[in-house]
A protein has these predicted regions:
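N-terminal subdomain of nucleotide-sugar transferases
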Residues: 1-32, 36-43, 170-174, 178
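Membrane-proximal helix-turn-helix segments that form the acceptor-binding/catalytic region
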Residues: 7-8, 107, 121-137
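A short, active-site helix/loop in glycosyltransferases that binds the activated sugar's phosphate group
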Residues: 26, 133-157
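An amphipathic, basic-hydrophobic alpha-helix
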Residues: 45-90, 94, 122-126, 130
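Active-site proximal beta-strand in glycosyltransferases
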Residues: 74, 89-109, 137-139, 159
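Helix-loop-beta element that forms the nucleotide-linked donor phosphate-binding surface
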Residues: 146-166, 170, 174
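Conserved NTP-donor binding/palm subdomain of two-metal-ion nucleotidyltransferases/polymerases, i.e.
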Residues: 180-368
């Protein structure tokens, strides 16, 4: 692989507003087709020459400056065993951008074995391992390259794009666009705006609160409903969002079938379990009828403690908000039981979060 084989795709949040930064001119017709069919505009970046380490420091500053100028969302790096390509990938990752790496057969056993002890080993330890393991996904040219990367045990998110080796620019454009969209959709939280999170939380609060409670829902103008849809799906709150928007008389764009869109598996995905349903599994037949609501309230808070706040979905928070806001139970009985279980401090933290996210009022809390 030569130093010139490096490309960066710079994508904005819009589907058809994409910028491609490449170190060498694209072949005839490809740049024009990218622009006409997919709205991808191409730009050229010059790579520094030579292997002087001081030039790498200078190049690192150049890459950061270039990325700050273009405000990309995706950086696509082509090549292996190139420290400058690794610099681009590292800078993009530190700036919280989606990164795609195309090794171009550079990680095959035949290539790795060449001068392994003299050069490949230290290059592997210094930057090549991090370049592959910490990127968003790897774009392989064929199934063999995919197996080579899998064999190294560094990455499981691997896309096979045979079109990269062909001459059909249409197939290449379609394959690249599909891969970039999948990577963007999988990493949507990197670009999530505060107003988009507030929009979802406001619709949830509107769905649960009484009609006399007025909630100001942010306008969708300037927001990405696609990202909001992904967030609602991952937080198990899609139906609550739609119910809240309907209650507020707000028109939502056409529903996105998030479940069937291609995305990478999130290893940090939250547990999609309902606190209400888990609390109902507790046998309350031996408890007097007048105390069952208190027992279920305690069990919901216990289940929230067991799950952990970081693993709770927005639906779980909505269930807790509904518990504090709308359920009719004796706060003294519930409070004494939570003290007995040593959950007073945890409950007070829940109340604080509910006040911040859903504007829960003081009159509805268990512990003042």
């Amino acid at each position: 692989m030569t130093d010139a084989v490096l490309r960066m795709l710079l994508a904005t949040s819009k589907v058809m507003d994409v910028h491609l930064l490449t170190s060498s001119p694209l072949r005839d017709g490809l740049a024009a087709e990218l622009t006409e069919r997919y709205g991808i505009k191409t730009h050229l970046v010059e790579l520094s020459e030579g292997n002087n380490p001081l030039r790498y420091i200078e190049y690192n500053k150049y890459v950061r400056t270039r990325i700050e100028e273009c405000h990309p969302h995706i950086v696509h790096v082509h090549g292996s065993w190139d420290v400058k390509a690794a610099i681009v990938q590292r800078c993009a990752r530190k700036m919280k951008l989606v990164t795609i790496v195309s090794p171009h057969r550079g990680l095959s056993p035949e290539i790795i074995d060449i001068d392994f002890w003299k050069s490949r080993l230290w290059k592997m330890l210094l930057y090549q391992i991090q370049m592959i393991s910490r990127c968003t996904a790897v774009a392989a040219m064929n199934d063999k390259e995919r197996e080579d990367v899998l064999g190294l045990g560094l990455k499981r998110r691997i896309e096979v794009m045979p079109a990269m080796t062909g001459q059909n620019s249409g197939e290449l454009c379609a394959a690249l666009t599909e891969t970039y969209r999948k990577a963007l959709d999988s990493s949507y939280r990197l670009f999530l705006l505060d107003d988009e999170t507030k929009f979802l939380e406001a619709t949830v609060r509107t769905a649960i609160a009484d009609d006399d409670v007025k909630t100001e829902i942010p306008s969708l103008n300037g927001l990405s409903f696609r990202r909001i849809s992904f967030l609602a799906f991952d937080e198990d709150a899609t139906e609550i969002m739609k119910r809240g928007a309907e209650k507020a008389g707000m028109y939502l764009p056409q529903e996105i079938d998030v479940a069937n869109l291609p995305r990478y598996k999130n290893k940090h995905a939250k547990t999609l379990r309902s606190l209400e349903e888990m609390s109902k599994t507790i046998n309350v037949n031996h408890i007097p009828e007048e105390q069952r609501e208190e027992r279920r309230a305690v069990q919901m808070i216990v289940q929230a403690w067991t799950m952990g706040k970081k693993r709770m979905t927005l639906r779980n928070w909505a269930e807790l908000y509904d518990l504090f806001r709308n359920r009719d139970f004796n706060e003294d009985i519930v409070g004494n039981e939570l003290r007995h279980r040593r959950l007073k401090r945890f409950t007070k933290r829940l109340q604080k979060d509910l006040k911040s996210r859903f504007a829960l009022k003081e009159g509805y809390v268990i512990f003042q």
